[in-house]
Regions:
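Metal-cofactor-dependent catalytic cores
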Residues: 1-158
Length: 158
């Protein structure tokens, strides 16, 4: 259950074999290596499973901006694991920590770096990877594992 006017998890997205778009699920366990049932080809092949790239988050508003510019995007299209509502992109600064869900059960993630656009985004148009540069989302590590569900509150801890 979410509280009004508070940030929350709008959608949880996974892709068991990689690729875009990721598909929505209602609930998920978040581990140090990412979301159960999700496979990130780039992280596993190019980054050797780097845990600082365990989770990808993006605000819904960023996806909506691209949609208003004519790109056919919906939550999950950018490859993000968590689409957040009520959060601005500039709030996802490096080092920022967030609790997703209940204080005693929800995962705690830490923003680590910008996710650079990859060639998989070409499915949305030739110029899209360039247009998405700096706005693809933010990679995060998992400080505390836990379970989170769609609609869960997002609390900034730092």
């Amino acid at each position: 259950m979410r509280l009004s006017n508070r940030p929350f998890v709008l959608q949880i997205n996974v892709s068991p074999r990689g690729g875009l778009p990721k598909k929505a699920v209602e609930t998920v366990k978040v581990t140090k290596m990412g979301l159960e049932g999700d496979y990130n080809t780039f992280r596993m092949t190019k980054l050797s499973g780097d845990p600082t790239s365990a989770v990808l988050v993006i605000p819904r508003e960023t996806i909506s901006e691209f949609a208003r510019a004519g790109y056919k995007l919906v939550p999950g299209s950018m490859g993000e694991n968590f689409t957040l509502e009520g959060v601005q992109y500039d709030e996802l600064s490096i080092g920022r920590r967030m609790l997703l869900g209940k204080k005693d059960q929800g995962p705690i993630i830490k923003i680590e770096r910008v996710c650079d656009p990859c060639d998989e985004l070409l499915v949305y148009g030739k110029s899209f990877p360039k247009d998405a540069y700096g706005k693809r989302g933010m990679y995060a590590s998992v400080e505390r594992e836990g379970r989170v569900e769609k609609g869960a509150p997002v609390e900034f801890l730092s």
